[in-house]
Amino acid sequence: MFLFLLLLSASRSGEESPSGDAVPLATGGLNRKSFPEGFLFGTATSAYQVEGETHQDGRGPSIWDAFVKIPGKIANNATAEITVDQYHRYKEDVDLMQNLNIDAYRFSISWSRIFPEGSGKINSNGVAYYNRLIDYLIEKGITPYANLYHYDLPLALEQKYQGLLSKQGRFCGLRRVLFQTFGDRVKNWMTFNEPRVVAALGYDNGIFAPGRCSEAFGNCTDGNSATEPYIVAHHLILAHAAAVQRYRQNYQEKQKGRVGILLDFVWFEPLTSSQADNDAAQRARDFHVGWFIHPIVYGEYPNTLQNIVKERLPKFTEEEVKMVKGSIDFVGINQYTTYFMSDPKISTTPKDLGYQQDWNVTFNFAKNGTPIGPRAHSEWLYNVPWGMYKALMYIEERYGNPTMILSENGMDDPGNITLTQGLNDTTRVKYYRDYLVQLKKAVDDGANLTGYFAWSLLDNFEWLSGYTSRFGIVYVDYKDLKRYPKMSALWFKQLLKRDQK
């Protein structure tokens, strides 16, 4: 009720709600003119979460196709075989974005849809699909942002070479084909989405594919949490840097594009003003976003990791340092939430070593009994807008103010809400408005931000949560896959009107 009254107190936009009634879509004083000229607003998805058609048209299986078949791994044992079927409904989804005044669409390309075996023979049907998607985006005036990898390694590479644990160059074949085939139209490339999540959740606690970890940290049949996350992260950094190097050498001059990487960044705020809690928060930042952006900017891992992980942390050769350092044209920051961090005051060395264990911190979601912010449906996601400002200014100050996009931001509702409940998502409207106010503040204070992407365009398959979590600004009825723009979608439409003064 409070949110509804808050919206009512502001000026009405004249837009129609999904139910047909006039609703207030107050933007908090924000509009396109609030941001620098050329600033892009987009939405984002990933191939595995929205495409469906996992076993047809020549696509090979990914590690997630195998992982979802393990009973109990995914809520309600859901799969992504159909999900929201963007493979067949991409025109409908692009038309939706155009109607909502969206500038750009960030999507990922399924590696196993291009190379069913991870390398070797190319699947022409997969290439044709992405050609159709890219061409239709451009036809409708929407800029494509293509991500080369979003968690979905071809299963064949996992089975033959131990996947990302192997320092093998098969990613080279993928990015070569993608740059050659789509680079005449795609000018914004990302190599990896959230490589930290890939390494940590896939190899430290094993709750993501391929499900590897030490026995002490999860229910895994194989793995080593003390070493494997660091090996995988190292290989991802090298693969990223090699892709950027090759693009710059062979394609950038002609295609006039750019390449970046997408990093998740929870802001970690010290619980108290004590030095111990400040140190804990900084350790968390170093092990989180610093794990990747520090070597990419400075050519080495943060001192925190070097001092704590020691011989378990792989080393870059001199040639690799030259390749890795400076290997971004821009960086995407995925920012959703903020936590308080405190020092656990543990002086003894733990019996079992692992990536998360190495942080040596305590997570806190409240201070003096007061929650850090309202919680969304997901238990990890709290609405803390000021954390976005601090995260962006941290990158600006600590890493030389690189060109940035805010590549993911959003909140979820329960999967079982009704259509009526889902469409009137006033909490999401408030979330986006509050976070964009903080993003504008960061821009005004000097952060070199060039775009913002809402997660997500559509309700979709949400990894471990299956279909029990809805992040979309467009409601999807999973029975017939019909799309219904939510109030948050209409809010963006109002925000992004192009005739505003």
Curated annotation (Swiss-Prot):
The keyword Endoplasmic reticulum does not apply. Disulfide bonds join C213-C220. Pfam families: Glyco_hydro_1. Glycans are attached at N77, N219, N360, N416, N424, N448. It catalyses: Hydrolysis of terminal, non-reducing beta-D-glucosyl residues with release of beta-D-glucose. GO terms for molecular function: beta-glucosidase activity. One of its GO terms (biological process) is carbohydrate metabolic process. Residues 1-14 form the signal peptide. Its EC number is 3.2.1.21. Keywords: Disulfide bond, Glycoprotein, Glycosidase, Hydrolase, Signal. A beta-D-glucoside binds at Q49, H150, N193, E194, Y336, E408, W455, E462, W463, F471. The active site is at E194 (proton donor), E408 (nucleophile). It is an enzyme of class 3 (hydrolase). It comes from the Eukaryota. Belongs to the glycosyl hydrolase 1 family. This is Beta-glucosidase 43.
